[in-house]
Design a protein with these regions (language model features):
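Gram-negative bacterial Sec-dependent N-terminal signal peptides
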Residues: 2-19
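Low-complexity, acidic/polar, glycine-enriched regions of mature
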Residues: 20-189
Length: 189
């Protein structure tokens, strides 16, 4: 009888990690803005952001794993300059008529107890390539108005437009893109 109790306790302890909750979050489109920086003919740095994005994030903090899926409306790019917008959405660059969205799917990597990076695949302009994002900050807290946990992060990474088949106007360093992503996501019940 004594050994039977210990077997039950041991099995229960071993199975506890299997019941660790995977937490699901929905990206808050009002507080999430993928943005980019690139040179304008090597003269200055232009900054733009995408105003429409959606997605989901999963976190398993006990297992120190997670996943990210983000969809960005390519036509929502905003440089604050109409001519630049027209050029960016044209066939010369994003070609939003043919490729209306950009998709990023990746696995979150932890360093200690905190997410540190996302190793993922970006589909842009019909081409899928690996892109790693470094997470510079990450925090979760109960949101005072939503009464739910909300997590926020700032991440960054680099890509070359030519890798995605966008080779027009890449001289002068304009092909190199530095991305910055601010994201907030709301925990789902």
């Amino acid at each position: 009888m004594f050994s039977k109790k210990w077997i039950i306790v041991a099995l229960g302890a071993v199975s506890l990690p299997a019941f660790a909750a995977v937490e699901n979050y929905t990206v808050d489109p009002d507080h999430t803005y993928p943005s980019l920086e690139m040179t304008h003919m090597g003269l200055s740095v232009w900054r733009g952001k995408f105003n429409k994005s959606s997605g989901k994030i999963t976190l398993d903090r006990a297992a120190k794993t997670g996943n990210v899926e983000i969809v960005v409306d390519a036509a929502s790019i905003d440089f604050g300059h109409e001519k630049m917008h027209e050029h960016a959405v044209s066939a010369d660059w994003l070609n939003v008529e043919k490729f209306p969205t950009m998709n990023y799917k990746g696995a979150i990597k932890f360093k200690g107890d905190m997410p540190a990076s996302v190793d993922g695949q970006l589909t842009l302009h019909g081409v899928t390539k690996p892109v790693t994002l470094k997470i510079n900050s990450f925090k979760c807290m109960p949101h005072p108005m939503l009464k739910k946990e909300v997590c926020g992060a700032d991440a960054e990474g680099d890509l070359d437009r030519a890798d995605f088949g966008m080779t027009k106007y890449t001289d002068g360093g304009a092909g190199k893109i530095h991305m910055r992503i601010q994201v907030e996501a709301i925990k789902q019940d």
